[in-house]
């Protein structure tokens, strides 16, 4: 493999990591409060509101049901408005965030559902407000589950970013598609696959370590 190709792969790794972690961050900025809202408005929860729950749940389900490659193409006009272009690293972050947010919201809701109801009832009996319950009971107790959700999300985004590479998003996906598939270069394709596997392994390893650390606390 030539030296220019090796440097191209290094840049591809950096672009893939940037797309994954930046979109993961913004996905959590949107998905975490939506997931908390889904939980607290469920029937029987601290601010139960069946109509609001059904509405938010329906919106989340709609966006979760759209395959990412279709979402990527569908959002091209919207992406152009936000970042001024529909190709490249910055453009990819927009649909990646939109694709991740509803996925995160559901995982946050599921993590909160694992919390024993006795803890919530005890907090309510002591006069805690809904916001205090969320901040001091729900989120701390669900922290291991939230870290696990973040790990799964980042791994999913690695795959999404690779798909985005096929339409000019950059990263390892674009290198694999352009030089491996279109250019009939099996060495490049196999190298891209190995690098993606390594990235996923490292993210999973780090996530597992963090989960163990916060669980001990």
Curated annotation (Swiss-Prot):
Major location category of this protein: membrane
Gene Ontology CC terms: plasma membrane
Disulphide-bridged cysteine pairs: none
Gene3D superfamilies per UniProt: MetI-like
Keyword terms, alphabetized: Amino-acid transport, Cell inner membrane, Cell membrane, Membrane, Transmembrane, Transmembrane helix, Transport
Top-rank lineage group of the source organism: Bacteria
Protein name per its UniProtKB record: D-methionine transport system permease protein MetI
Organism of this sequence: Escherichia coli O157:H7
